Amino acid sequence: MALRSFCSADGSDPLWDWNVTWHTSNPDFTKCFQNTVLTWVPCFYLWSCFPLYFFYLSRHDRGYIQMTHLNKTKTALGFFLWIICWADLFYSFWERSQGVLRAPVLLVSPTLLGITMLLATFLIQLERRKGVQSSGIMLTFWLVALLCALAILRSKIISALKKDAHVDVFRDSTFYLYFTLVLVQLVLSCFSDCSPLFSETVHDRNPCPESSASFLSRITFWWITGMMVHGYRQPLESSDLWSLNKEDTSEEVVPVLVNNWKKECDKSRKQPVRIVYAPPKDPSKPKGSSQLDVNEEVEALIVKSPHKDREPSLFKVLYKTFGPYFLMSFLYKALHDLMMFAGPKILELIINFVNDREAPDWQGYFYTALLFVSACLQTLALHQYFHICFVSGMRIKTAVVGAVYRKALLITNAARKSSTVGEIVNLMSVDAQRFMDLATYINMIWSAPLQVILALYFLWLSLGPSVLAGVAVMILMVPLNAVMAMKTKTYQVAHMKSKDNRIKLMNEILNGIKVLKLYAWELAFQDKVMSIRQEELKVLKKSAYLAAVGTFTWVCTPFLVALSTFAVFVTVDERNILDAKKAFVSLALFNILRFPLNILPMVISSIVQASVSLKRLRIFLSHEELEPDSIERRSIKSGEGNSITVKNATFTWARGEPPTLNGITFSIPEGALVAVVGQVGCGKSSLLSALLAEMDKVEGHVTLKGSVAYVPQQAWIQNDSLRENILFGHPLQENYYKAVMEACALLPDLEILPSGDRTEIGEKGVNLSGGQKQRVSLARAVYSNSDIYLFDDPLSAVDAHVGKHIFEKVVGPMGLLKNKTRILVTHGISYLPQVDVIIVMSGGKISEMGSYQELLDRDGAFAEFLRTYANAEQDLASEDDSVSGSGKESKPVENGMLVTDTVGKHLQRHLSNSSSHSGDTSQQHSSIAELQKAGAKEETWKLMEADKAQTGQVQLSVYWNYMKAIGLFITFLSIFLFLCNHVSALASNYWLSLWTDDPPVVNGTQANRNFRLSVYGALGILQGAAIFGYSMAVSIGGIFASRRLHLDLLYNVLRSPMSFFERTPSGNLVNRFSKELDTVDSMIPQVIKMFMGSLFSVIGAVIIILLATPIAAVIIPPLGLVYFFVQRFYVASSRQLKRLESVSRSPVYSHFNETLLGVSVIRAFEEQERFIHQSDLKVDENQKAYYPSIVANRWLAVRLECVGNCIVLFAALFAVISRHSLSAGLVGLSVSYSLQITAYLNWLVRMSSEMETNIVAVERLKEYSETEKEAPWQIQETAPPSTWPHSGRVEFRDYCLRYREDLDLVLKHINVTIEGGEKVGIVGRTGAGKSSLTLGLFRINESAEGEIIIDGVNIAKIGLHNLRFKITIIPQDPVLFSGSLRMNLDPFSQYSDEEVWMALELAHLKGFVSALPDKLNHECAEGGENLSVGQRQLVCLARALLRKTKILVLDEATAAVDLETDNLIQSTIRTQFEDCTVLTIAHRLNTIMDYTRVIVLDKGEVRECGAPSELLQQRGIFYSMAKDAGLV
């Protein structure tokens, strides 16, 4: 009564009246309902949102938006609406003053509405000030207000049309005005305002339109339509991609994760410590001393907490970093889940409506509209949820990749050994992807149980306790699923381990491919890879069987639940009739149940995979980091005299291992030149590493003053232009740059590079000779203009002439660096008289230290060494005056030896070999003009081929290739089993509709109940058998395909010529063997199953709808056309985006690989931040392609679900229209199938697109499986006899060589005959073509003209392995592979242990190997990093001694060893290869002075040839080189 008196003065107006609103053919709301509920609903909505929204806006300030016409209009309309509401209020007061009694509601409602309009106007301005361009809150408010007003408007129009109707002119007029203004506000809210002032998007040339899109555009993903149209018209390119939103960039995302991880690590380390007793501090002890007195150590009794340090939780860190944004997805998911159950409830109402012939028609249309609206709301909620999940996943991946990269720059060398390059690449590719995938599913952990509980609740309402039978079936399945999840985790760990090992091995193979080819070891390593792959495939096969059982249980569970529930329902009580309402509402609920039951195991599997990845990532991120603070760095401005001070320092490579350097103490004054000498493995390089803080300092104190530059023993070259390699992030200073180029003898090289210093010099410098690479490395250091220079034997890779030039111009007392502090590790003795201090290393300790003269006077080990190995002509007495003390100018010593060293991996003598350095350094001055000319060239010459994206539709041949890889029988068997499964599913549901239409007999039971139930069960069993069959077939077929495609790729890559590896960045190949192969292994079989399932489900649903309502044939074809068009529209762009994403992924890995190889150089130059920035840019470039692809997915899904919702609408509408001619069973069947079709359509396009985007992996594997191949390895017809070559006679006949078709000749018309057993030296300036000659001999590069004849056999006519097994090389780069030492010597296990030990003894390694705990089984690290360069060179000598072929080639083989070891090696070669033909490329001429002949090469031509003594008499090139080396 109170409410009635509130609504009307006489109390006659109720709030609700069923007869007015429902039981009528012309429904309406009561006046009270209109004035209260319909007026208050929008007010309550806005006031309930206001507190949270105000808080959100106060925390998210995006900038200030200037007042625009749009904003002014919205504000003005807000005020007008307020005025209208208050006009109504004042009118009511006026009426009261006139004695007209009005209901209180006419005072309350306008007041409430007026205040709400003021709030709306306030929010419009607040949003503008906070930079909100389009508001969802406000648009929803105006929409709700309009819908409520629409109901009132309809009522007013109806009442106005009635005869004798009372019209309230003022209130009706204000209402019509109110309605119009609300409509205009709604329309205006659909548009977006301009960007805030100073917004980053204003300056961005290609900003993402999302940030400026309207709310409607954002929820429907309309803002990406422009890109979709562009992609449909022509293939998308990287230039078409938008910039990332600021909040998605690495710059924003990575630091937050890294900082949170650091905090978590600090927390986990903090443990309560209680000091029971601590001795008083000794005041005499120096402050900050790191030495703890032994007695003190004993006295300090510390009782620690008994708990160990807990592991830091990476999950907690990820949640803290990304949780707040991700939590929004909870709301959308909850809304979607609740809306999902509206479908079955409305279906129930529709079936009731069809059964009730008396119900008015408008109710049927109302239910249909309700079904459509609920489906549309469900669509919008679901895809906002997915969007948040995918964006969260993307951010997690970006953060993980960034964190891994940053960590890789910090970890210790010991940690580097425990995490190989392959493992770290997997962390960035596979593991980061696992987190990304999990972000999509993680909400299902709470959502799936919620859906199951709600479904069971509604089923209970429909079928009663019979539902417990279905629950029992589900409970029975739980332990089975749990067991499978545990097994999946086990297999996942095993799979990842095998994959890591395979990627690690492939990395090594790709890094050492040249050595494999020279030794003809490809087959041995192919077998190694295949054995790992076999293990991987075994695990995959077990996983596939598990997946088949899983699919069987997951797909069958909903049917078994339905069958058991229906069976119990009809059998427990004969009067329980399974009518259409019970059956199809239950079936709709069972269909809802199907999804959480299917998805839960997948979620569990995804969580299992992610937990494995989480652990791997946590272990990596928890690795020990280098402690740069262990070395004290001081400013150059600090007044102390010494540049480097080391006091009693002990260093080790890994904690817990014996120290490598012991008790090191020395001081170096500013500007001094210090040489470090000693035998192989004595700790010279380790000393430099210790100064760079690359080693673990056990004790002692080290101080460095100023910045440091470092030139490593193995030159590290970036895949960039020559100029960028030298500048290394510093700005270009033209004059200084030219001076550095001249000093480092690089000017002549610019003449022969296609674009001068802008020429791209390839990954790891593959188109430079060893000497050129080292000079680029040296120039980088010199250009950095640092205070301290650490040189690790840089002069060894160049010939004597260039070495002398570099020493004089750069390192020496008169060089560019004369005022800098320089530490030079060297094996040469010719420069020692000119240095200020010599440090002699022995066994990790400093054995002697002093100036050259002091060490001679001391007559110790150094003096003895000099007397033994200095050139006989050297007059030591004459050198007294030339010894340089501190600050004295020294005169270069002409005689002495220079030990050469060739450094860097994969030395490819490319263009450089077509020219050489001129003999006269004065000519280099004239080459400044060449530098300027080269710099002026606009086009940079490219060596590396970037990973290219294919365009257009994926070729049918790619699908056909995949089908062939699976096997045609398995392919067609799978399709047949899919068909059987879906036919039996359709039949069982149609059978159910017939069952529900069975009329009950007189006693209230159904006559054919048992028969119907038996057939229904039989059809279910048939369905289950088909499911198990196709799951098994697809899984096994997928493994067949994986095996075949990997084998083809591996087979082809190993048979590719060297030119292929020079052009192709290793990142591209690693990407194929890791990410693309993982897609083929794991993704494609799953996608095939889901695609086939979706396709048949859609076809089945359409058939059922057409059977039930044939009139639907009118609407299905047009909707089908819309669907097809949208799908093609999408796939065109999606496919290209996937390709662009794949292509942009390779540079991330390439850059990462490059960084790991040069990490010590990057750290030495303190360039970590620049490299991190470059990595972030590459990751962002990759995400720029990924982000539009996930949005395109949502764009498609929203549009497709709208098509699906239209099918639901028309199926229900036609059922309502035809209700008098349709049975309830058919209506139920038709509408329940139409409810599913939305999901089916969505999945079908998603899966067809996933199919096409994932099959791109097959296309990319195929791309590298069909590249050019080198000549056959074995040719039976022309194979030489086993005794060949018998004498070792080598004949070059008019031989010419070029590296590629488009390049000039590097060897020109060589005509030389070398008799069997001859010892021939090959000499020439750096880049003269010496190594090119050996490449031609091994057919690494095929001849352009002419031929090489060995013992009468033209080598071009025989197989490559026939040739390469019969000749041996000790190459420039001593490459070792991870594995046992024995495997590195004899990968085919052809020789006995005795023979291997003999080879090691002759190579002077027996003592070293015998001292190792595992002897021959000693495990070599990746790249042989746990051996010194000299030891690696000796291992290569041992390989040659094992093979003992008739022809031996030494390519500067003793470069990295000390003079004493070199002498032993030379005598070994002379005695062991006495009857062999030996070709030696030498920079150190004294090693070939006793050879029978010397060939002098210059610019690819033979300039001189004859005995060394003859050539010296000729006074030509050889004479000038010998003079430079101090031999004449």
Swiss-Prot record:
Which major enzyme category is it?
Answer: translocase
According to the UniProt entry, how is activity regulated? MK 571 inhibits sphingosine 1-phosphate and leukotriene C4 export.
Q: Mostly located where?
A: membrane
- Annotated ABC transporter domain residues: 644-868, 1290-1524
Cellular component GO terms, alphabetically? apical plasma membrane; basal plasma membrane; basolateral plasma membrane; lateral plasma membrane; plasma membrane
Q: Which InterPro entries match?
A: AAA+_ATPase, ABC1_TM_dom, ABC1_TM_sf, ABC_transporter-like_ATP-bd, ABC_transporter-like_CS, ABC_transporter_C-like, MRP, P-loop_NTPase
Chain positions found as Phosphotyrosine: 277
Q: What residues are glycosylation sites in this protein? A: 19, 1003
Q: Which residues bind ATP 2?
A: 1324-1331
Per the record, membrane topology reads:
Multi-pass membrane protein
What does it catalyze?
A: ATP + H2O + xenobioticSide 1 = ADP + phosphate + xenobioticSide 2; an S-substituted glutathione(in) + ATP + H2O = an S-substituted glutathione(out) + ADP + phosphate + H(+); leukotriene C4(in) + ATP + H2O = leukotriene C4(out) + ADP + phosphate + H(+); sphing-4-enine 1-phosphate(in) + ATP + H2O = sphing-4-enine 1-phosphate(out) + ADP + phosphate + H(+)
UniProt-annotated stretches for the region Disordered: 876-895, 909-929
Among the GO biological process terms of this entry, one is:
sphingolipid translocation
Chain intervals with Polar residues compositional bias: 910-929
According to its UniProt entry, the function of this protein is described as: Mediates export of organic anions and drugs from the cytoplasm. Mediates ATP-dependent transport of glutathione and glutathione conjugates, leukotriene C4, estradiol-17-beta-o-glucuronide, methotrexate, antiviral drugs and other xenobiotics. Confers resistance to anticancer drugs by decreasing accumulation of drugs in cells, and by mediating ATP- and GSH-dependent drug export. Hydrolyzes ATP with low efficiency. Catalyzes the export of sphingosine 1-phosphate from mast cells independently of their degranulation.
Regarding protein family, the annotation reads: Belongs to the ABC transporter superfamily. ABCC family. Conjugate transporter (TC 3.A.1.208) subfamily.
What is this protein's record name? Multidrug resistance-associated protein 1
Organism of origin: Mus musculus (Mouse)
Q: What is the lineage of its organism?
A: Eukaryota, Metazoa, Chordata, Craniata, Vertebrata
